[in-house]
């Protein structure tokens, strides 16, 4: 009896696709698939969905169609049938500083939803997801975790440096310098024209490179996937190898839940800290852990951060770009250093089918004399740059990125703004001055909605030369390219009645990153008076994507996810 004649299928690798294409009752399904190139033999193979985030809206993703085809070819060569489909991407770099940036965090959920929906509908047995821009990585991973089918993530790769060692953040900071009168429009345009030379994700240890590195450390990417140039043969080879590797995962029945364990998340956090990675990793890793059923909290970043140093001299706080780290071996040699020091769990399973320790056993050390990754005995910072702060301004926590260059303590007078646009106008017209604590509120997950990145304001502050003289705190978040004395993810957010919504102009605020405390210097009676007088503002959106997002999204301290049971029960 042929496979089409019988729904019974002994091949455990086809437990999903067999339901869709096997047996006489599925003739219509097979007819549809024949029209997109399936043959009789293809119906007998495991189907591998290739989730591509290709788009021409951003250079981060403009090459991913080539990588998706390579992954599909790899799946075919290994005995499967690759099927490419697309999900969305937006561009944080284009949208930053505009209302459109409110869609950025929502896009993470849309990516996850669409990967889950297409793969669940089509009956893919395994999935390769390929991401480039910031929200692609966690969006893809949340989608893969929900499906819990044999899967691999492929990073689209990093961009090359622009002329003069420039990148996207160079442009934002040039704009800030222009507002201060320190650069001419001609100088800004000269940087604008060369900073982004072609495809690939933003070049520093910003959010995209941070999350790609975290996913590799977690074991959900092939070794070295996070550290390859976007336009390179090695990245095409990585994509093809991922397609092949999914067939091995199907054979061994290794699923994301077997890899994304508590120890694997601890490995990811360790590598993020060692690389000096983005604050957004806190938000995204907590969201990914929530999806796969692993308990992870803000305090885990504090505990791990006590024993893990910052080793990488990478932008935005350091000097080098990801392409330069690629040239000396990527993150694998650093992971071997961390493993040998007892800072990584070597027994974690990975998508190679081997443990992390087995993957790292024969890694070549960094070349002698390189200055990008510092030795453990002489780190850039002896403990984490990611600080989790509490206090009467952030009873449920806040996230700061403190390298030490900007100091570890700041006291100043509050300059309060109820939107990013309000703050940006006052920074640009030079109203904001040294000694100020810029407070940007009603920019949280629900209040914004969408938890916009404050890259434009922080870049303007840096461009004015005030990086160590002005602090910025917000219930929004920051780009991986933000640096300076900045604290974000303040919870509870203003829109739900958090204390940041009670701050008034002129209030004294202290940010103490040594003791991880953020204090609004008013007494309890005054706090109570203000709380009694506070009224929640009307929602900014009542229809559409952002209204739905605001209704279902959780607190930033829980990863700003949209499928927590308590949100869905409302």
From Swiss-Prot:
[2Fe-2S] cluster binds at residues 60, 133, 202. The modification N6-carboxylysine is found at residue 135. The keyword Flavoprotein does not apply. Residues 1-25 are annotated as: Disordered. Pathway: Amino-acid biosynthesis; L-isoleucine biosynthesis; L-isoleucine from 2-oxobutanoate: step 3/4; Amino-acid biosynthesis; L-valine biosynthesis; L-valine from pyruvate: step 3/4. One of its GO terms (molecular function) is 2 iron, 2 sulfur cluster binding. Mg(2+) binds at residues 92, 134-135, 453. Its EC number is 4.2.1.9. Keywords: 2Fe-2S, Amino-acid biosynthesis, Branched-chain amino acid biosynthesis, Iron, Iron-sulfur, Lyase, Magnesium, Metal-binding. Gene3D superfamilies: IlvD/EDD C-terminal domain-like. The active site is at residue 479. It catalyses: (2R)-2,3-dihydroxy-3-methylbutanoate = 3-methyl-2-oxobutanoate + H2O; (2R,3R)-2,3-dihydroxy-3-methylpentanoate = (S)-3-methyl-2-oxopentanoate + H2O. GO terms for biological process: isoleucine biosynthetic process; L-valine biosynthetic process. Homodimer. Functions in the biosynthesis of branched-chain amino acids. Catalyzes the dehydration of (2R,3R)-2,3-dihydroxy-3-methylpentanoate (2,3-dihydroxy-3-methylvalerate) into 2-oxo-3-methylpentanoate (2-oxo-3-methylvalerate) and of (2R)-2,3-dihydroxy-3-methylbutanoate (2,3-dihydroxyisovalerate) into 2-oxo-3-methylbutanoate (2-oxoisovalerate), the penultimate precursor to L-isoleucine and L-valine, respectively. Belongs to the IlvD/Edd family. This is Dihydroxy-acid dehydratase. The gene is ilvD.
């Amino acid at each position: 009896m042929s496979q089409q004649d019988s729904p019974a299928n002994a091949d455990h690798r086809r437990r999903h696709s067999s339901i869709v294409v096997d047996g006489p009752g599925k003739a219509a399904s097979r007819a549809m698939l024949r029209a997109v190139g399936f043959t009789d033999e293809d119906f007998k193979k495991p189907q591998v969905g290739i989730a591509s985030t290709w788009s021409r809206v951003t250079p981060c993703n403009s090459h991913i169609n080539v990588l998706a085809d390579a992954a599909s070819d790899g799946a075919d060569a290994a005995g499967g049938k690759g099927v490419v489909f697309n999900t969305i991407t937006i561009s944080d770099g284009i949208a930053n500083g505009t209302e459109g940036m409110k869609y950025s965090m929502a896009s993470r959920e849309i990516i996850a939803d669409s990967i889950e929906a297409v793969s669940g509908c089509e009956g893919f047995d395994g999935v390769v997801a390929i991401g480039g821009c910031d929200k692609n990585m966690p969006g893809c991973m949340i989608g893969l975790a929900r499906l819990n089918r044999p899967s691999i993530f492929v990073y689209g790769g990093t961009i090359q440096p622009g002329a003069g060692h420039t990148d996207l953040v160079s442009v934002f900071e040039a704009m800030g310098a222009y507002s201060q009168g320190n650069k001419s429009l001609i100088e800004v345009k000269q940087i604008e024209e060369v900073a982004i030379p072609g495809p690939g994700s933003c070049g520093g240890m910003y959010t995209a490179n941070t999350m790609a590195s975290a996913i590799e450390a977690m074991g959900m990417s092939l070794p070295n996937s996070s550290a390859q140039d976007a336009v390179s043969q090695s990245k095409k080879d990585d994509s093809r190898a991922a397609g092949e590797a999914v067939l091995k995962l199907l054979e061994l029945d290794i699923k994301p839940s077997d890899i994304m364990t508590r120890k694997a998340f601890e490995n990811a956090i360790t590598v993020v800290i060692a690389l000096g990675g983005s604050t957004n990793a806190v938000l995204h890793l907590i969201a990914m852990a929530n999806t796969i059923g692993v308990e992870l909290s803000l305090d885990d970043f504090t505990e791990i951060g006590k024993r893990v140093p910052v080793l990488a001299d990478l932008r935005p706080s350091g000097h080098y770009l990801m392409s330069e780290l690629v040239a000396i071996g990527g993150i694998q040699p650093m992971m071997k250093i961390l493993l040998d020091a007892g800072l990584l769990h070597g027994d974690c399973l990975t998508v190679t089918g081997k443990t992390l320790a087995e993957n790292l056993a024969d890694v070549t050390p960094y070349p002698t004399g390189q200055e990008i990754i510092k030795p453990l005995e002489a780190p850039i910072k002896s403990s984490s740059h990611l600080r989790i702060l509490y206090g009467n301004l952030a009873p449920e926590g806040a996230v700061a990125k403190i390298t030490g260059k900007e100091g570890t303590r700041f006291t100043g007078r509050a300059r309060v703004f109820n939107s990013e646009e309000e703050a940006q106008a006052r920074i640009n017209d030079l109203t904001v001055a040294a000694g100020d604590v810029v407070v940007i509120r009603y920019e949280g997950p629900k209040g914004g909605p969408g938890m916009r990145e404050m890259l434009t304001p922080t870049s303007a502050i840096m461009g004015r030369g005030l990086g160590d003289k002005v602090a910025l705190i917000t219930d929004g978040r920051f780009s991986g390219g933000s640096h300076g004395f900045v604290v974000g993810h303040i919870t509870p957010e203003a829109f739900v009645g958090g204390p940041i919504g009670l701050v008034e102009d002129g209030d004294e605020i202290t940010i103490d990153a040594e003791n991880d405390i953020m204090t609004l210097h008013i007494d309890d009676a005054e706090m109570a008076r203000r709380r009694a007088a506070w009224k929640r503002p009307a929602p900014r959106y009542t229809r559409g994507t952002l209204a739905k997002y605001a209704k279902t999204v959780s607190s930033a301290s829980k990863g700003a996810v949209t499928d927590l049971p308590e949100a869905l029960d409302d």
